[in-house]
């Protein structure tokens, strides 16, 4: 899952699982595959080599303790990605990463769980984005929000995300 806006995109490593299960699903392979897939998408579809920021799992993740996921999983994954010439940076603390002065330096931001990156992203852009499913042999785009059943038939839905899908498709073809 890549939530894309022209300014930057976000991608959670884990998606729709309870927060208490996130650390159990994290591993180097998943982080590496996510970053490689984003890198390939940016190079093939957007014709640029992205700068990818990785957000840590724990508060103040820059403080390295013996038992944290950053030291065991995230930092080794970053090192392996750098050896493959992928522009990755981090891990960054989630609570301050989405400040304006940080965002202009990166094309894509990988977080460890859904709300870690989607909450600040939607606070900044609202529904001015598209949901892109990466890793498929074809391009799959969707609106960046769920079905919003309570609004069905009320003519109140924001169409910005759907409009962005068409703009995006026209911009790359």
Label the model's feature ranges.
Residues 1-173:
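Anion-binding alpha/beta catalytic cores of soluble intermediary-metabolism enzymes, centered on
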């Amino acid at each position: 899952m890549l939530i894309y806006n022209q300014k930057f995109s976000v991608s959670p490593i884990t998606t729709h699982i309870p927060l208490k299960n996130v650390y159990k699903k994290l591993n180097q392979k998943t982080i590496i595959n996510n970053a490689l897939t984003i890198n390939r998408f940016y190079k093939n579809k957007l014709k640029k080599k992205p700068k990818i920021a990785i957000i840590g799992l724990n508060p103040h993740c820059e403080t390295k303790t013996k038992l944290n996921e950053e030291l065991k999983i995230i930092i080794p994954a970053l090192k392996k990605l750098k050896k493959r010439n992928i522009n990755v940076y981090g891990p960054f603390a989630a609570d301050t990463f989405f400040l304006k002065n940080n965002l202009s330096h990166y094309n894509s931001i990988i977080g460890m769980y859904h709300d870690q990156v989607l909450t600040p992203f939607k606070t900044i852009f609202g529904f001015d984005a598209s949901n892109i499913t990466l890793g498929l042999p074809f391009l799959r785009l969707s609106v960046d929000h769920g079905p919003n059943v309570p609004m069905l038939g009320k003519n109140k839905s924001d169409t910005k995300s759907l409009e962005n899908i068409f703009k995006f498709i026209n911009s790359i073809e």
